[in-house]
């Protein structure tokens, strides 16, 4: 039996107590995992189609739930805590990682809002926590800023959720973060913030030769 923690050895022991203490064998773990997945996949009932179609649907649904990854743990008091990859400190609350928004902002995250509204609300708050801790919204977290993925796709998640009634984050804080990232480029990472932003606002486009990927950024 192996456990881990991003926080401390003591927290790893606590994770073991919460997740594996009292578990008899691998079959029990397997059964609990199957029950957990059935609960999530059971949120959608498919009608019509062949058995192969249903298998394809639920396989895709399963894959849609693999990211973003949970990056928080529960302490002895049952409170969510996490080691932040953005400032190197331990904070109370929720944090998620391993998402590059590579078209997930178009469909997966709106789907998450429908199927997992509580988790999605926590995820949105974690985006702004990352901004508070690092000065920038994540563009590709792995587990902190990886520097990849052009565009500011976190903007669309925050706007979409607010329009649909999610209130887990401060809209003024979100607006501040979006304005900041739309009018500046981080001194680290290729795609954190918005490179070429000045040319775009002055000329209406990002010209070739001044920054990478000008067509996509325009």
Label each PLM-derived region with a short phrase.
Residues 34, 38, 61, 108, ...:
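Extracytoplasmic/secreted envelope proteins and their assembly/folding machinery
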């Amino acid at each position: 039996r192996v456990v881990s923690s991003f926080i401390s050895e003591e927290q790893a022991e606590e994770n073991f107590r919460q997740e594996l203490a009292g578990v008899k064998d691998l079959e029990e773990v397997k059964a609990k995992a199957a029950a957990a997945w059935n609960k999530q996949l059971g949120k959608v009932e498919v009608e019509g189609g062949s058995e192969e179609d249903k298998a394809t649907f639920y396989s895709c649904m399963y894959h849609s739930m693999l990211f973003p990854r949970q990056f928080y743990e529960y302490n002895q008091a049952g409170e969510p805590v996490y080691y932040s990859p953005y400032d190197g400190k331990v904070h109370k609350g929720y944090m998620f990682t391993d998402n590059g928004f590579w078209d997930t902002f178009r469909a997966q995250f709106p789907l998450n809002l429908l199927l997992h509204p509580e988790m999605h609300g926590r995820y949105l708050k974690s985006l702004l926590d990352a901004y508070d801790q690092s000065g920038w919204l994540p563009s590709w977290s792995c587990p902190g800023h990886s520097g990849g993925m052009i565009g500011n796709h976190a903007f669309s998640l925050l706007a979409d959720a607010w329009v649909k009634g999610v209130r887990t984050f401060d809209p003024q804080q979100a607006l501040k973060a979006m304005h900041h990232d739309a009018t500046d480029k981080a001194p680290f990472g290729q795609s954190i913030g918005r490179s070429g932003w000045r040319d775009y606002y002055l000329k209406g486009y990002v010209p070739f030769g001044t920054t990478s990927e000008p067509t996509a950024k325009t």
